[in-house]
């Protein structure tokens, strides 16, 4: 199977982005990773992202500071005055853990690195259960890809398209876990907890989803 040339993967340190990183290693010749320190409550995830990038032997791992998020209020992930919810995500509205425009900002920054590195794929691990978040939906990914192509120096010079690689859009978290098992992802070295505690709290929405997805695997 022919491999694509290069990709930069958004790597949080969680099971979804780790699986995407291992999938990228299989599908691409050159793999870069990028992580973000945006004042998140669960900043400990960056420690896991660094270890995963090292294990995956990526070309380079960039950790980017996004300090302005600490000025925003209302999200449980960046505002310590907002309590992290327990239990499942709400079904029909964005949860209190939504960080405004996070994936738009992250994809924009990653696209600048992709432009500079001259790789034309940007990987993001959004999946079917992420749909309560507006910036995880298929229509957002399509729009983001269009905007990146409209503004890319790489595209203008090379006459090649940029692609937002989001292979998990139609997959459940369990599907991702099973794929990760097949790829040999070290799930024990991933981290998913909105509280940012070690060990994880086991009660927040992402802890619950992780436990259900990895049942019988980890």
Swiss-Prot record:
Q: What keywords appear on the UniProt entry? A: ATP-binding, Ligase, Metal-binding, Nucleotide-binding, Queuosine biosynthesis, Zinc
- Mention any Pfam family matching this sequence: QueC
Q: Which cofactor does it need?
A: Zn(2+)
EC number(s) given by UniProt = 6.3.4.20
Listed GO biological process terms:
queuosine biosynthetic process
User: Which GO molecular-function terms appear in the entry?
Assistant: ATP binding; ligase activity, forming carbon-nitrogen bonds; zinc ion binding
Query: What SUPFAM superfamilies is this protein classified in?
Result: Adenine nucleotide alpha hydrolases-like
Q: Main EC class of this protein? A: ligase
The free-text cofactor remark is:
Binds 1 zinc ion per subunit.
The record lists the catalysed reaction(s) as: 7-carboxy-7-deazaguanine + NH4(+) + ATP = 7-cyano-7-deazaguanine + ADP + phosphate + H2O + H(+)
Residues binding ATP:
11-21
The positions annotated for binding Zn(2+) are 193, 201, 204, 207
| Gene3D superfamilies linked | HUPs
Supply the InterPro entries for this chain. QueC (IPR018317), Rossmann-like_a/b/a_fold (IPR014729)
Q: Copy the pathway line from the protein's UniProt record.
A: Purine metabolism; 7-cyano-7-deazaguanine biosynthesis
Q: Which family does it belong to?
A: Belongs to the QueC family.
Q: Which HAMAP family match?
A: QueC
Write out the function statement from the record. Catalyzes the ATP-dependent conversion of 7-carboxy-7-deazaguanine (CDG) to 7-cyano-7-deazaguanine (preQ(0)).
Q: Which protein, by its recorded name, is this?
A: 7-cyano-7-deazaguanine synthase
The species this protein was found in: Aquifex aeolicus (strain VF5)
Q: Which gene encodes it?
A: queC
